[in-house]
Amino acid sequence: MENKKENAVERLLKSYRRFYNITRFDGGISPPLEEGRNLREAVKLSPFREDERNGLAAVCEYYEKTCQHLFLKSNEIWSANQEEFIFLFTADHLTADLFERCRDYAYNAGMEMAHIGSGHMYTYVSPVFICGKVDDAALNAVENCRIYKTFRFSLHGLLEFH
């Protein structure tokens, strides 16, 4: 079963690699940053490991800035920054307790990595679980987990955790 989990992690990260900066925490090799992508906040994180086979496998980061200029690039009229963070966790058996610890870790790490301020539009934080078994309580907790947070009455954007 361990081999199936590793294959699932590799296939999932391969599909994210085109648009996301990937930082591996499971011993895998993090791909180098491509030209034009120079932001990688996940390297500052201390990884969440339950044991050798359970914990944070990788963090995928996506950053986008949209802006409008007037005649020159230095004359910026407006800008909007969008960020997405995917926390990929692996577990042999996902329990409600393990889910809550992973959820809290992903939320707190996502808040640390987010660049909140003027021009910030949104940050999406998504925990993704690859596991062998799931308790009913954990499945219910995963399905009902939604956290929304606004910054300065949405003037500095919002954070959506799902």
Give the ranges of each region predicted by the language model.
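A short, structural micro-pattern
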Residues: 80-82, 121-122, 161
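Short secondary-structure capping micro-motifs at structural edges
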Residues: 73-75, 106-117, 144-145
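Charged, structured surface patches that assemble and position nucleic-acid processing machinery
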Residues: 145-162
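Active-site-adjacent loop/helix micro-motif of nuclease/hydrolase catalytic cores
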Residues: 93-112, 136-140
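Nucleic-acid nuclease catalytic cores
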Residues: 116-143
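Short secondary-structure junctions and interdomain/linker hinges
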Residues: 19, 23, 109-117, 149-152
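Structural motif
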Residues: 88-93, 129-133
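N-terminal, charge-rich interaction modules
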Residues: 1-91
